[in-house]
């Protein structure tokens, strides 16, 4: 079972704007939490979540919705060709593809910024400013 939950701030986002509820679910045993940061993550995590026997909470930041011209709610361009084959091959072979694995977006030696979801784009801007 996959439960998709929109959250996060964006213009006219109604009851979703003030809640970042991932911490509510993180300590529940047997519950898988996913939070995509780009269109490829969104596809891969949804397909992989649907194949799991465990319940999955699929959190979706509203800033990633309605990408006009590939723009996030923060003005970042994330045009992406989505690969629909790699995750399917991993599932068919019984492997995990992205679940349970960290995605290191940028390496470095001075500081560590840990984030998830749409905030990856904000963290990347911060890292660029700090470098």
Model-assigned labels for residue ranges:
Residues 1-114, 119-122:
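Conserved thiamine diphosphate
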């Amino acid at each position: 079972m996959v439960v998709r939950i929109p959250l996060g701030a964006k213009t006219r986002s109604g009851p979703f704007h003030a809640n970042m509820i991932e911490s509510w679910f993180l300590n529940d045993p047997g519950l898988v939490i996913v939070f995509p940061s780009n269109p490829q993550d969104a596809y891969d995590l949804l397909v992989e979540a649907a194949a799991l026997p465990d319940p999955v909470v699929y959190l979706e930041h509203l800033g990633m919705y309605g990408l006009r011209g590939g723009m996030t709610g923060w003005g970042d361009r994330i045009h992406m060709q989505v690969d629909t084959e790699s995750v399917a091959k991993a599932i068919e072979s019984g492997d995990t593809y992205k679940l349970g694995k960290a995605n290191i977006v940028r390496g470095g030696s001075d500081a560590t910024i840990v984030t998830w979801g749409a905030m990856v784009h904000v963290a990347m801007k911060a890292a660029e400013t700090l470098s």
